[in-house]
Amino acid sequence: MRFQLFYILGLLSVTSLTHAASNLICYYDSNSYLRQGLAKMHTNELDLALQFCTHLVYGYAGLKSGTLELFSLNVDLDMFYYKDITALRQKFPQLKILLSVGGDRDVDEAHPNKYVELLEANRTAQQNFIDSSMILLKRNGFDGLDLAFQLPRNKPRKVHGSLGSYWKSFKKLFTGDFVVDPQAEEHKSQFTDLVGNIKNAFRSANLMLSLTVLPNVNSTWYFDVPKLHPQFDYINLAAFDFLTPLRNPEEADFTAPIFFQDEQNRLPHLNVEFQINYWLQNHCPGQKLNLGIASYGRAWKLSKGSGLSGAPIVHETCGVAPGGIQIQSAEGLLSWPEICSKLSQNASAQYRGELAPLRKVTDLTQKYGNYALRPADDNGDFGVWLSFDDPDFAGIKAVYAKGKGLGGIALFDLSYDDFRGLCTGQKYPILRSIKYFMG
């Protein structure tokens, strides 16, 4: 493992390590309290994790359509949980605790574009958002607000589609197959103005402001990097879920590779390196950026036509594979303890069907990530292909972040790590690995 870490350092585009990354941003989804069984997470189970975290981001608040006010997505839970969470500062006085808005948890089928509506709103309506945010934050003892706005996403690439002539401009190179927001330039300017107004109000109240760039939200469309970065205390890039079984049901590939693999018509922006470099090349200080790592994996259902090797890109997949027994996700999401329980542990054990273990394939190059698979049987059933970052690969990414001169790592999120120690007996193995290799 140590040899592999030194190896990847040689692949970095920097020549020296000038500092130790210091930020470890820990996301906590309050919905984890509502889960059943072993997936249910209580606030007292955060204590062990918070000795490693510099910031805790509590998710998620929402944006009220019409009035555009910040509001709790679960009043019955949050009316108690908000203050329980901020009270953790008594045990961890150096911990900064922020409330995140959006984060793909603010589901509003009647107003799916309400975050764009906030950008387009007049100054009075935007002030409702600012004022309501300050009231909610101050009333409950939060240190600041994290903007995880649910903005329009890149369209997924077309299966077997041609990339044409590699597009006619850099912007098209970064957008995927289609432009989904023809008013993107206007929205970029509006977002910059809104953030400036929020920052001005927060500054007088001594409140922090951070940005989370959600997966597949196009930075070239919405973020004027040179103007934006001075307004934020830090910026978290959720550099994962580039491909998922929901977005890409007919082909499976690495969900969060570090580097671009120039094969099989992959899109060149679907990797960590491209996302980080875009912000750095647009004059964002590295210390403002935190690399986002997922503590979960994504699972596709394999067909007989998907073959036996599992080497990505895997074709003829059939969308989402069944979730694990703890999270029970309908989106092909498996937490780390769910993943490790599916990997082969006992070579002598004989299981068939859905109980048969998955065979893990480790990426010896440490560039793209690990995967595991169970080919479909003769009837085309029980096939699974799973992409994930295990504790070792999360450590590799921590080393990468140090080498790029970034501020640190953002872990999405604590409730998907093995907070009960079910895999090996050690609790929070992904978080621990990140902290160890950050130094």
Curated annotation (Swiss-Prot):
Disulfide bonds join C26-C53, C340-C423. GO terms for molecular function: chitin binding; imaginal disc growth factor receptor binding. InterPro entries: Chitinase_II/V-like_cat, Chitinase_insertion_sf, Glyco_hydro18_cat, Glycoside_hydrolase_SF, Glycosyl_Hydrlase_18, IDGF. Residues 1-20 form the signal peptide. It is found in: Secreted. It comes from the Eukaryota. Keywords: Developmental protein, Disulfide bond, Glycoprotein, Secreted, Signal. Glycans are attached at N122, N218, N346. PROSITE patterns: GH18_2. One of its GO terms (cellular component) is extracellular region. Residues 22-439 form the GH18 domain. Changing V116I: In strain: MB08b, MB29b, MB36a, MB40b, MB47a, MB48b, MB52b and MB58b. Its main location: secreted. Primarily expressed in yolk cells and fat body. In larvae, it is expressed in large salivary gland cells and weakly expressed in imaginal disks. Less expressed than Idgf2 and Idgf4. The keyword Ribonucleoprotein does not apply. The keyword Glycoprotein applies. GO terms for biological process: carbohydrate metabolic process; chitin catabolic process; chitin-based cuticle development; ecdysis, chitin-based cuticle; epithelium regeneration; imaginal disc development; regulation of stem cell division; wound healing. Lacks the typical Glu active site in position 150 that is replaced by a Gln residue, preventing the hydrolase activity. Its precise function remains unclear. Belongs to the glycosyl hydrolase 18 family. IDGF subfamily. Cooperates with insulin-like peptides to stimulate the proliferation, polarization and motility of imaginal disk cells. May act by stabilizing the binding of insulin-like peptides to its receptor through a simultaneous interaction with both molecules to form a multiprotein signaling complex. This is Chitinase-like protein Idgf1. It comes from Drosophila melanogaster (Fruit fly). The lineage of its organism: Eukaryota, Metazoa, Ecdysozoa, Arthropoda, Hexapoda.
